[in-house]
Structures are given as structure tokens and as C-alpha cells.
Amino acid sequence: LGSGQDLLVKKGLYEYLDSKHNITFIRINKRITENDRESARYRISWPKKLMVRNDMHFYRFIRIFLQFLCKTGIVLFKNNRVYKDSLLFYEGRTWFIAPIAVMDYIVEYVNKHVDFYDYWEDSLASDLMFFQTIIMNSPFREKIEDELMYVKFGKTFKTMNHPVTITNKDVCLIEAGNFFCARKFELEEKEAIDYFINKIK
């Protein structure tokens, strides 16, 4: 799954995928338990008014506070939806490449487990856990490798939740790793865009 700010950065993606046709490339950071702050993503039924997409908005500080409370066992706005399956929760990243068999499994699972789908309705950033949890509780969990997407997140409070713009300084890091795609590109760093476009022509 990609977006308009992603680019191919190396030739041979299709050939590489053919050579690993049964592998799902996805970043799985860790299993999430109720002792993790990240469990607030699904344990809280997040009020929609708190979902303001502004990194310095007061509501972001409220979200952070609620997450730390959740880690200590205090769950405000508890998610009272239930799901029947006994699943382990996992968190990772949004971008992944999966074989058709895995995608079919995900679609079939969601269709058969509407309660699991509904469980995430008022969650926070569910794209970081929804697919990861399904895959890691499936027979396909044994055939997983790290994502093929280069992403660098910011290090400041304002940027830590977002990929930062790729510049010429990232070129060496991208080429040194097993990356076929990269995110995110912006026109103000056109040199990096031109470099990779010319490279994969």
C-alpha cells in the first residue's frame, strides 16, 4: 500500500517479489499488551472531537495523557465493543506488500468477523494495528519479512508521528538498505526526486 508521496527507488521490484512470492513484507514493531501505552489505540473509544490533526493542538496533549493513563490501568472512555476471537494484538506500520493469498485471507477474515471490524470503529490510528493483528494471528505469520519501504520519522515533538521529507542526505541510507520504495517526497527537495526517477528509468 502506497500513496502519492512515495516513489520507487530501485529497479527489480517485480522480479524480487517473484523470487519471494509467498512472503509478506510488513513492519511489525511488537506485540501489544495492556501494559503498553499503544493499547490505548483499541481499549479507548476515542471521542471524535479529540481527533484533530494538528500536532500542537491542545487535544493532542489530551490524547497523550489518556494513553499514559491507559498504560497504568486507568481506561477513560472505555471501548465496550467485544470480539469473539482470542487474538494477540500487534503494532507496526501502515505500508506493506502482501501476496494475493494474504489479502484474500484478510478480506475473508473481516467478512466473517464483523465484530472484529466493529471493534476498531472508534480506535486511534487503527491502520497501525488492524492488518498487523490479523496477519500475525494467521498461518501467514511464519512468512514475514521487514517492509521494503524506507521511511524516516521526525525526532521532535511536532514531527515524531510523521515521515519527514527525503533529501539528498537520505540517498546513501536508501541505497545501503533493502528498499525498493521510499516515503515521503516533496517538491521542495526536487533533487532527491529527480535522482531516483532517473535511476529507475
Positions of PLM-derived features:
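ER/Golgi luminal nucleotide-sugar-dependent glycosyltransferases, focusing on the catalytic module
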Residues: 1-201
